[in-house]
Amino acid sequence: MMIPSGECTYAGRKRRKPIQKRRLTMGAEKSNPSKRHRDRLNTELDHLASLLPFSPDIISKLDKLSVLRLSVSYLRVKSFFQALQETCVWSAPALSPEEHSYRGFPVQEGRLLLESLNGFALVVSAEGMIFYASATIVDYLGFHQTDVMHQNIYDYIHVDDRQDFCRQLHWAMDPPQVVFGQSPHADTDNTVLGKLLRAQEGGKGLPSEYSAFLTRCFICRVRCLLDSTSGFLTMQFQGKLKFLFGQKKKTPSGTALPPRLSLFCIVAPVLPSVTEMKMKSTFLKAKHRADIVVTMDSRAKAVTSLCESELHPKLNYLAGKSNGENGISLFRGQTDRSHWARALARSSCLCLRGGPDLLDPKGTSGDREEEDQKHILRRSPGAWGQREMHKYSYGLETPVHLRHLNWSTEQRSQESTTKLTRQPSKNEPSTCLVPHGSCVPYPGSQGMLSASNMASFRDSLDHPTGAYCSQMNRPLSDIHQGQVDPSTCHISQGSLGSRIPLTGMQRFTARGFSTEDAKLPSLPVTIGTPCNPVLSLDVPIKMENESGSQDIVEASTTSCLWLGTSDMARGHLVGFPARMHLKTEPDYRQQACTPHLGHGMLGTNPYSRDTVGSCREHAPLYSAHCTCLDPEPPHHLFMCSHSESQHPSLDQDCRAPIVKREPLDSPSWAAPGQVTVPRMFPKSASKTVIPSKGSDGIFLP
């Protein structure tokens, strides 16, 4: 039986046996031979129907043709199993008949196996006849088992999928064209099928070289009575082609035909969506697309920073690829040996002007550092979560070229202040000078820098530099470091380092982008330029008890350090007892940085004057991205100092201004001449070491 021609018709609900009306006999009637024949035929059909393996309520609904069709189908199935037992060698059952019973009742293993399937069993002959369909077909298609047995399979397949289903029934997926009067078997088919049949009859099984040709897995649309929308349900057919023994078919001339390959498969529905599923198990089936395009939620796209155009031609693993914004960053830079060096971020670098530069002196990644890092990772449960989040950034694909920046001063007449302006000049690489007696920075320490040139660190300074790590971003082991050419060393203005990095010092640009593109607000250090942009660790701090409000007002008006934030807070100045106010009383020096390193970083201020007892205002030191303890970064710095102008010698050490630490607890600090709110620092600010007496200097970034 092949694909039906003519108009496309699909199988529907079968016609049931009509209810016969019985007339009451009124006495003796004349006998009718035709009626007696029909009665004998109906009696035989009823007896035949009673022999079918169905329940009485199902049998009572069957018409005469259905009883004959099901009887033929039952006999064919029985003949198949009898022939299978004769040709195949069956091993002895592992369990005895007594063990197949539960509490004296036999266990129907076949029914339990069918119920466990996420689908139904189906056997289709080579002619397209449904040889067998399990009773569970009614749960998926709405057809009862008695409706489909020994029926044409193409009546249930969508018209667009019938040719594909016909190809699946052939061993080479190339069925021959059936011509009237000729055998459907070609010479090639007879040769291959004969070889397969002899191998299986001999008990050897199917040859391995033909196993790939006999495996089937395809999808077709099948007629479904349970679907009220389209009437079809997409089903997956998965199984193999096997010989259907015991059919004993013959040609028109009477020659017996060999067994034909038939499709033995499990038919499972391909469910369209999760909300429409009616499933017995947790296994799902889906039809994959060829491009393997991943679909993402809008929230997932926001996290991964990917759009539809980026996801369309990509594979699934690219959708969740890291963009380097979260987790642990990997810095990558080119060394002087023309190879790339990678290193993990040691800590978060808190700089005065927000420059994302990180300086790591050579030799800090020693054995003791690795031991300290492992010890920190063992005692910190949160560090293991960061260890699993390795994210790599490949922003530095080219060597970093630094751009030399010139700084000039610009006087503002209205506010009587001096403003720094940055002017670009020629792209000349800056060189680093190794000074004598400079302080070695602690890049692992978590510190705070203020405009008053005070650096406070939470960690003690008793351990070597390699033992320090930031509490915000703990370092991990296995750091591959490389060295950068010292001729291109670059230090950010107000960074944690208090001097120029040594020769062989490592420099990595944070977040994986180049320095030139990021436009870092920092200064290239040239030869002869002092590189103490911040106050060194030796800052003298003077502690005094609280005094009267008059003393506070007088002290704040004569010699105070005011860090401006905004003019809105002038009338709302409130003291906080938990915070301390830091102010400086420096002796003015013409140069603002370490004198033994050369000329001043900012140069001599042409607008500066030496006055006695007057307030001198210097350049604004803070940028909009300053990292300090206060919520808002300051914009300007106004410094008042006494008159004493001496140019220190080049051999003197850099000294810090004397910082007085006083409590701020009264709103009477707001003097008429005050323009901004003083900076607040908590009492828990770390103390620093007091150096020996000497000439003082003012440190400007």
Curated annotation (Swiss-Prot):
There is a cross-link at residues 583, 660 (Glycyl lysine isopeptide (Lys-Gly) (interchain with G-Cter in SUMO2)). SMART domains: HLH, PAS. Pfam families: HLH, PAS. Residues 409-430 have a biased composition (Polar residues). Induction: By 3MC. Up-regulated by 2,3,7,8-tetrachlorodibenzo-p-dioxin (TCDD) and beta-naphthoflavone in pituitary. It is found in: Cytoplasm; Nucleus. The keyword Transcription applies. GO terms for cellular component: cytoplasm; nucleus. Residues 106-176 form the PAS domain. Residues 409-432 are annotated as: Disordered. Residues 25-78 form the bHLH domain. Keywords: Cytoplasm, DNA-binding, Isopeptide bond, Nucleus, Transcription, Transcription regulation, Ubl conjugation. Residues 555-701 are annotated as: Needed for transcriptional repression. One of its GO terms (biological process) is negative regulation of DNA-templated transcription. Its main location: cytoplasm. Signal peptide: none annotated. Coiled coil: none annotated. InterPro entries: AHR/AHRR, AHRR_bHLH, bHLH_dom, HLH_DNA-bd_sf, PAS, PAS-like_dom_sf, PAS_fold. One of its GO terms (molecular function) is DNA binding. Interacts with ARNT, ANKRA2, HDAC4 and HDAC5. Interacts with ARNT; forms a heterodimer with ARNT. Mediates dioxin toxicity and is involved in regulation of cell growth and differentiation. Represses the transcription activity of AHR by competing with this transcription factor for heterodimer formation with the ARNT and subsequently binding to the xenobiotic response element (XRE) sequence present in the promoter regulatory region of variety of genes. Represses CYP1A1 by binding the XRE sequence and recruiting ANKRA2, HDAC4 and/or HDAC5. Autoregulates its expression by associating with its own XRE site. This is Aryl hydrocarbon receptor repressor. The gene is Ahrr.
